[in-house]
Amino acid sequence: SQVGHPTLSPDDNILIFASDMPGGFGGKDLWYVEAVDGSFAGSIPQNLGSAINTAGDDMFPHYRDNGDLYWSTNGREGLGSLDIWKAEGREGKLAFAEPMALPYPLNSSSDDFAIAFRDGAEEGMFTSNRMGGKGADDLYSFKLPPLEFCYQAYVFDYDTGMPLSGVTLTLASDDGSSNVFTTDSDGELS
């Protein structure tokens, strides 16, 4: 069996890696071991399961400092042969949301793999054999733009359907910031 592409969880207690060892779902799967008293020695590898692994090859995992797991697979429908996927980390050991493919231009119609983020930043690097490169597999850097949302909202009385004025709403963000809005005479937030 082959083993490669190790990545550590943010707390350094879980090591995820790719391997073609028996007991997987496809060619190469993502497996993990847990540290016992700060050591991985003697830990028995466990498969990450079918929510992450496919009948194809699942490789190049990267555990981000926020708990999100990134990896590449050719076992899910995407833009190319090998695409980068993400499963957002959830509370609990090895708990992840439904995987989703990263959009273009991070994924392309070619092989895209081995993404790595800088700690605490929305930037990093990945490898691709896409057209326009300098060789077979090239490194590409990226910086994700900040998310911006535009919204328009109205507040109405549930029973009468009439707009409510003077209602105060607080919109809270994941980063702890918040904005306070008050409705006008038409019930619109301003």
Which functions belong to the PLM regions below?
Residues S1-Y154, Y158-L171, N179-D186:
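Short, conserved micro-motifs composed of acidic
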